[in-house]
């Protein structure tokens, strides 16, 4: 009996399944991305059912990009924390044209030769949840939340249910890997439908579409995510080689060609004046859109310029979010409290009658500092106008002085710290008033909480409530006191049993093994974040070496500028801090590290500066190769620079190198030099 007499062959079935997948993917793309249906719903449903039946009969035919795999898997038990291949930076915010111009002036100081009409790309900022998508050879392999920017939660199963996210890229020649960033959101229509359904079932209503989208993505059951019908706009693409060199507008066009939805109202603006006009136009029109937008993202068009400007620890220097004016509401100021932070900064906080703003109820707002108090001329009992800056953070905008009670008393910052009673100081050229008493309970509490945080010493179980008890009972007056605590003493604390006490003692003991870079970050030196701490610890491999470094030596470290260098140098001159270092060393903390061991010393003593875009290497890759050969990479050109490695469209660093007669290398010459160093 022949195969034709018994039914279709396995090959024919596989071909039909492949054909169905392609037809359904094309129809889904046309419907959800282009909004141009090419197939009636009934036809789509019939083809979908045919593919579903084939896959049920032949499970080996199921592929990760099959439309049937969007429906949702079985509920998960939790989300795994995953490392982003490329960090998800947040954006600096601007709330008016003046702040936008200030940003523009800042980046131009770093790239002074860029013409006035450098070019900007304006994109509407979607009010949703930031998402990172990872593709390998064209297939979606992972999706994650932003998290802290470095690590997020892996929610691939949930993201597969969003029909505007392609499971397979629309290209015959996909790169080995591709990272796509974008915003998952709920349309206003779907948001209203969901709240209507929840109200019928007696469930709590979502406060706003952003909260609904973020909460939906963290559902353990993908079937719930599928039911809520999230949408997605892509706004960033990163990949190897040519994929990494697209200018901003071209990168958005590329995303669209790969099958992604991209917010359609983007615009290239040659000048900042046109950016401001775009923002003004959309501020008036934004409520006509079918989804929420809370501002305009302004990015430099040139990818070369983006690469040259790079990032701060938190933001890209080449982009900013220009936020719309928020909704405002009047309320009555009841009183002002003063908080003391871990650096001793006094922050006045307005306490006012609860008021609804942007979907949430607020009753407190920071007043920042004494200057802001003076500008507002606040009096207790005033009627104040409150808004949400960026529709997230409450702030006091102005005072309605015509409504001020006759007996209202002005608000002023105290001359003594509300926590310890010691006189406060306001250093010259600073807006912040500070308590400088290192034993102030508020400063000690803040220092302990920071020391125990995940990126510092990572002491599990040492939370804010326990820290409050330890400080209020006088058991801990400085970080080093933690290492004298024992289990019986801890077990005597409120709501703290023997088991918890034993666990905390073990966690504190374990923290003695944390590396020098974490200890340095845990010290809480102003301006020294975890990245800067790693860079400093790699260069100065002990607390003693760091303490003896001059400001110039500190500023020469990659990523460290004069402000950070001065803060570090000043910290080590304070006697209290010197005593703390000695006590930590006695307690067994790691105040010594090991310098990164280069594979060779062939480039020892030579300093390199990187500028422009290299053909195949990223800056971090080039830096790692140089350091592995014993060389040093600096962020600025000086007479001590040995070589400047210049890529395409190198900027002012190359010009300075030429003026100083410093040798220049291209990528090929750098690789040749490194090859010689290897042997």
From Swiss-Prot:
UniProt cofactor(s): Mg(2+); Mn(2+)
GO cellular component terms given for this protein: cytosol
Biological process according to GO: DNA repair; DNA replication
Catalytic activity field: NAD(+) + (deoxyribonucleotide)n-3'-hydroxyl + 5'-phospho-(deoxyribonucleotide)m = (deoxyribonucleotide)n+m + AMP + beta-nicotinamide D-nucleotide
Keyword Acetylation: no
BRCT domain residues: 598-679
EC number: 6.5.1.2
Matching SUPFAM superfamilies: BRCT domain, DNA ligase/mRNA capping enzyme, catalytic domain, Nucleic acid-binding proteins, RuvA domain 2-like
Active site: 125 (n6-amp-lysine intermediate)
Any Pfam family: DNA_ligase_OB
Molecular function GO terms recorded: DNA binding; DNA ligase (NAD+) activity; metal ion binding
Key words of the record: DNA damage, DNA repair, DNA replication, Ligase, Magnesium, Manganese, Metal-binding, NAD, Zinc
EC category name: ligase
Binding-site positions, NAD(+): 41-45, 90-91, 123, 146, 183, 299, 323
Superkingdom as given in the UniProt entry: Bacteria
Residues involved in Zn(2+) binding: 417, 420, 435, 440
PANTHER family reported for this sequence: CHROMOSOME TRANSMISSION FIDELITY FACTOR 18, DNA LIGASE
Family of this protein: Belongs to the NAD-dependent DNA ligase family. LigA subfamily.
Function description: DNA ligase that catalyzes the formation of phosphodiester linkages between 5'-phosphoryl and 3'-hydroxyl groups in double-stranded DNA using NAD as a coenzyme and as the energy source for the reaction. It is essential for DNA replication and repair of damaged DNA.
HAMAP family assigned: DNA_ligase_A
Protein name in the entry: DNA ligase
Lineage: Bacteria, Bacillati, Cyanobacteriota, Cyanophyceae, Synechococcales
Gene name in the database record: ligA
């Amino acid at each position: 009996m022949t195969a034709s007499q018994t039914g279709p062959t396995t090959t024919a079935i596989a071909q039909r399944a492949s054909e169905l997948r392609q037809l359904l993917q094309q129809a889904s793309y046309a419907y959800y991305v282009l909004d141009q249906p090419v197939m009636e719903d009934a036809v789509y449903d019939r083809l979908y059912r045919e593919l579903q039946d084939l896959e049920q009969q032949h499970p080996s035919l199921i592929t990760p990009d099959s439309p049937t795999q969007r429906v949702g898997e079985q509920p998960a038990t939790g989300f795994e924390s995953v490392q982003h291949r490329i960090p998800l930076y947040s954006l600096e915010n601007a709330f008016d044209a003046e702040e936008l111009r200030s940003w523009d002036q800042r980046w131009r100081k770093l790239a002074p030769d860029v013409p006035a009409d450098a070019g900007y790309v304006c994109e509407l900022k979607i009010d949703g949840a930031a998402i990172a998508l990872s593709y390998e050879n064209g297939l979606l392999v992972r999706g994650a939340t932003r998290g802290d920017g470095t690590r997020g939660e892996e929610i691939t199963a949930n993201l597969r249910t969003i029909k505007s996210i392609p499971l397979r890229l629309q290209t015959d020649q996909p790169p080995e890997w591709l990272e796509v960033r974008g915003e998952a959101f709920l349309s206003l229509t779907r948001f209203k439908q969901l709240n209507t359904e929840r109200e019928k079932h007696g469930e709590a209503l979502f406060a706003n579409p952003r909260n609904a989208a973020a909460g939906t993505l963290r559902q353990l059951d993908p079937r719930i995510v599928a039911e809520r019908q999230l949408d997605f706009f892509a706004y960033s693409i990163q990949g190897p080689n040519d994929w990494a060199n697209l200018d901003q507008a071209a990168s958005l066009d590329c995303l669209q060609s790969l099958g992604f939805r991209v917010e359609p109202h983007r615009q290239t603006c040659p000048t900042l004046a046109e950016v401001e006009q775009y923002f003004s136009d959309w501020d008036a029109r934004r409520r006509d859109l079918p989804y929420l937008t809370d501002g305009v993202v302004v990015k430099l068009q040139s990818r070369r310029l983006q690469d040259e400007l790079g990032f701060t620890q938190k933001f890209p220097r080449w982009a900013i979010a220009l936020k719309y004016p928020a909704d405002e509401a009047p309320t009555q100021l009841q009183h002002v409290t003063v908080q003391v932070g871990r650096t001793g900064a006094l922050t006045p906080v307005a306490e006012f009658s609860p008021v609804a703003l942007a979907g949430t109820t607020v009753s407190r707002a920071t007043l920042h500092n004494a200057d802001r108090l003076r500008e507002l001329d606040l009096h207790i009992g005033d009627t104040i106008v409150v808004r949400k800056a960026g529709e997230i953070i409450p702030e006091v905008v102005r005072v309605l002085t015509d409504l001020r009670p006759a007996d209202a008393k002005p608000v002023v910052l105290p001359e003594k710290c509300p926590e310890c009673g010691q006189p406060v100081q306001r250093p010259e050229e600073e807006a912040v008033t500070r308590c400088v008493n290192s034993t102030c309970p508020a400063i000690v509490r803040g220092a302990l909480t920071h020391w125990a945080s995940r990126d510092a010493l990572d002491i599990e179980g040492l939370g804010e409530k326990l820290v409050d008890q330890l400080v209020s009972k006088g058991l801990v007056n400085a970080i080093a006191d933690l290492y004298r605590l024992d289990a019986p003493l801890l077990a005597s604390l409120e709501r703290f049993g023997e088991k918890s006490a034993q666990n905390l003692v073990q966690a504190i003991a374990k923290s003695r093994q944390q590396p020098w870079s974490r200890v340095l970050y845990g010290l809480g030196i102003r301006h020294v974040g975890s990245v800067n701490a790693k860079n400093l610890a790699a260069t100065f491999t002990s607390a003693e070496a760091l303490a003896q470094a001059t400001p110039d030596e500190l500023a020469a470290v990659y990523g460290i500028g004069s402000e950070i260098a001065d803060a570090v140098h000043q910290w080590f001159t304070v006697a209290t801090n010197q005593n703390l270092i000695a006590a930590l060393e006695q307690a067994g903390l790691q105040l010594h590290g090991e310098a990164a061991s280069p594979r060779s010393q062939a480039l020892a003593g030579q300093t390199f500066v990187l500028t422009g875009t290299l053909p195949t290497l990223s800056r971090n890759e080039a830096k790692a190769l140089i350091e592995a050969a014993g060389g040093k990479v600096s962020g600025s050109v000086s007479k001590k620079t040995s070589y400047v490695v210049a890529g395409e469209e190198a900027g002012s660093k190359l010009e300075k190198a030429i003026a100083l007669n410093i040798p220049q290398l291209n990528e090929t010459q750098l690789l040749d030099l490194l090859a010689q160093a290897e042997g």
